[in-house]
Amino acid sequence: MINFPQHPRQTLELAGFLPEASGRAVEWLISDSQVPYSEAVAAMDSRAAAIAAGDANELVWLLEHPPLYTSGTSGQAADLLDPRFPLHATGRGGQLTYHGPGQRVAYVMLDLKRRRPDVRAYVAALEQWIIATLEAFNVRGERREDRVGVWVARPDKGVGHEDKIAAIGVRLKRWVSLHGIAINVEPDLGHFAAIVPCGISDPRYGVTSLVDLGLPVTMTDVDLALRASFTTIFGATVNASGSEPAAGSVNSSSV
């Protein structure tokens, strides 16, 4: 069992996630077409095992899924209000969420043994990565102690209203991270209405996207910002070969 330090994520020192001096750059891969969820998880698990064994480089894999819902280890069946899309049980932390076109999913496979074996600080580092990415578009993303993910204030909706713009869910195997983050660029936000997102039913807390906030942002814009902000927290990246990680079955590119 992993023991979590009992201190706020805002106060965690995020230094220490850069790799060892002798470490290789993180491979960076972008899939051009939608990737079925089961295929992505199988490829991610395989790559993580290879990283743990020292047989593969760390990897960040950016992709989009076809419409689906995933349930984390704390997911509740009652939170699926309308099963309009397939539901996948997954080993990541958290509850129910939606994935689909227009949402940038980043699966992050890092060896925390050679960085910093601290799960809570790693989640905070992922949040900071998202916050720094949003800053490139003049969007103020914020973390909340009682709600993992990144939020934006919505005073236009009323006092105390906030919308979630990015979700985080992680799992570790032999201190190699799996799963990662999902940023809403231009998904169909109506699909979130079929679930209680992340188990949060308070009507003050909704879901938004960059386009919903009025920004003419493309997926390529977000990918470039993600890569630039990633290097400041986790270190250098290098373009991955097009055949990884899904055994040649996924069309891919690097930017």
Curated annotation (Swiss-Prot):
- Taxonomically, the superkingdom here is Bacteria
Q: Where in the cell is it found?
A: Cytoplasm
Which chain positions carry the site (Lowers pKa of active site Cys)?
K164
Which residues make up the binding site for substrate?
R92, G93, G94, Q95, L96, T97, Y98, H99, A167, I168, G169, G180, I181, A182
What UniProt keywords are attached to this protein's entry? Acyltransferase, Cytoplasm, Transferase
Q: Which residues form the active site?
A: C198 (acyl-thioester intermediate)
Sorted alphabetically, which SUPFAM superfamilies does this protein's record hold?
Class II aaRS and biotin synthetases
**Presence of keyword Metal-binding:** no
Kindly state which reaction or reactions the protein catalyses.
Answer: octanoyl-[ACP] + L-lysyl-[protein] = N(6)-octanoyl-L-lysyl-[protein] + holo-[ACP] + H(+)
What do the Gene Ontology cellular component annotations say?
cytoplasm
The record ties this protein, via PANTHER family, to:
LIPOYLTRANSFERASE 2, MITOCHONDRIAL-RELATED, OCTANOYLTRANSFERASE
Similarity section: Belongs to the LipB family.
Family annotation (NCBIfam families): lipB (TIGR00214), PRK14341.1 (NF010921), PRK14345.1 (NF010925)
Protein name, per record: Octanoyltransferase
The organism's lineage is:
Bacteria, Pseudomonadati, Pseudomonadota, Alphaproteobacteria, Hyphomicrobiales
Q: Which gene encodes it?
A: lipB
